[in-house]
Amino acid sequence: MDNDILKRLDPEVFEAIANETKRQTETLELIASENFTSKAVMEACGSVMTNKYAEGYPGKRYYGGCEFVDVAENLARDRAKKLFGCEYVNVQPHSGSSANMAVLFAVLKPGDAIMGLDLSHGGHLTHGSKVNFSGQFFDAHSYGVDKETGIIDMNKVEEMARRVKPKLIITGASAYSQGFDFKAFREVADKVGALLMADIAHPAGLVAAGLSANPMPHCHFVTTTTHKTLRGPRGGMIMMGKDFENPLGLTINTKNGSRVKMMSEVIDAEVMPGIQGGPLMHIIAGKAVAFGEALQPEFKAYAQQIKDNAAAMAAKFLAAGYHIVSGGTKNHLMLLDLRNKNVNGKVAENLLHEAGITVNKNMVPFDDKSPFVTSGIRIGTPAMTTRGMKVAEAEKIVEFIDRVISAANDANVADVCKAVRAEVRELCLGFPLNNYGSLV
């Protein structure tokens, strides 16, 4: 990446970017929601597309001069449709949260009941948390995992649905290492007259590669981020396997009289002008590039390696006496419950940071500690896999983590972290990130 102009004109920002580049280059990124985009994606995101306002949709813009950004957005939409096997897609949401907000506001009224996975059991803020719009505008009810197995009990989900009669049921998670049975959720939704939304922000890349269940045949709406396992720029997206008439009875007047609006029309209007104005066309261009990359055969091999690395790490952790919520992983992440290691999530995160390993503290189901302390850490493999690391490296990384956590309460913990950091740096330099040119 050529940053000579930035270095000369704004050395302070340049220095921040240079230091972040060094951090990414020399340390291990194990946060499950993070990844490294390709140089092509970054070039698109840093292109002249950032200069263009394009309120509206391709062919129906409020501004002139949109003929080329229309090309980029249509490429993104067409590639996403091919990637996920869907009939409708909106690539304009700025984030996964705004994608979720658009769907909820499109199909619900304030006070309507919704159901989603409890945040402390692995869910997401936008699935009904009381500190989020989803729990403030709507009557949110949270289902959870079984205390013994750490897995969602569909019988309890159905019991809750029959009791609260939600208008919308949300599947998906930010810290759940098992899959979702979309068919079973749809059966529950149909029994209570609810719509069903799948938030696949975390496993989207695995879904695209055919290595995780595709929700399109069963869910009315599918939302996702475009980074994480999909390895694109930070952003959001809304999809539907099949378009359908909106169930709210919303109509539109045409030359031939009024008709019921299609759900795609309702969602498009909710994204813009409902909650957003101008889309970020440089990011949409980056999304198009990332979707094109994900359509290549190499991406499926990458996604498989993500799963292989995660499975190897989980097995190694279990062999070392760690407790993994739900007993293992079927995707790209795992949630370690550290209570049997006499260390909390905050301490573990900080010590691992000193050792050059980035993870995030995370609540575990039925946690007795606050979200600022937590009893666990979340670990994911997308970023390390992008570097080219495989099972052997995954197992070595578990050894690094175990050395640090095992020494957490020892007087020499600082020395252990320093020694591990040197080994982590050596490992990372053996799997370089080639996207950043000569910035450092």
From Swiss-Prot:
Pfam families: SHMT
Requisite cofactors: pyridoxal 5'-phosphate
GO molecular function, one term: pyridoxal phosphate binding
Pathway in which this enzyme or protein is active: One-carbon metabolism; tetrahydrofolate interconversion; Amino-acid biosynthesis; glycine biosynthesis; glycine from L-serine: step 1/1
GO biological process: glycine biosynthetic process from serine; tetrahydrofolate interconversion
GO annotation, cellular component aspect: cytosol
Keywords from the UniProt entry: Amino-acid biosynthesis, Cytoplasm, One-carbon metabolism, Pyridoxal phosphate, Transferase
The keyword Cytoplasm appears for this protein: yes
Residues involved in (6S)-5,6,7,8-tetrahydrofolate binding: L119, G123, H124, L125, S370, P371, F372
Known catalytic reactions: (6R)-5,10-methylene-5,6,7,8-tetrahydrofolate + glycine + H2O = (6S)-5,6,7,8-tetrahydrofolate + L-serine
SUPFAM superfamilies: PLP-dependent transferases
Site label Plays an important role in substrate specificity, positions: H227
Protein's UniProt keywords contain Chaperone: no
Main location: cytoplasm
Record PTM N6-(pyridoxal phosphate)lysine, positions in chain: K228
The protein's Enzyme Commission number: 2.1.2.1
Cellular compartment(s): Cytoplasm
Subunit (UniProt): Homodimer.
NCBIfam families reported in the protein's UniProt record: PRK00011.1
Family to which this protein belongs: Belongs to the SHMT family.
Function: Catalyzes the reversible interconversion of serine and glycine with tetrahydrofolate (THF) serving as the one-carbon carrier. This reaction serves as the major source of one-carbon groups required for the biosynthesis of purines, thymidylate, methionine, and other important biomolecules. Also exhibits THF-independent aldolase activity toward beta-hydroxyamino acids, producing glycine and aldehydes, via a retro-aldol mechanism.
Record's protein name: Serine hydroxymethyltransferase
Organism name: Chlorobaculum tepidum (strain ATCC 49652 / DSM 12025 / NBRC 103806 / TLS)
Gene: glyA
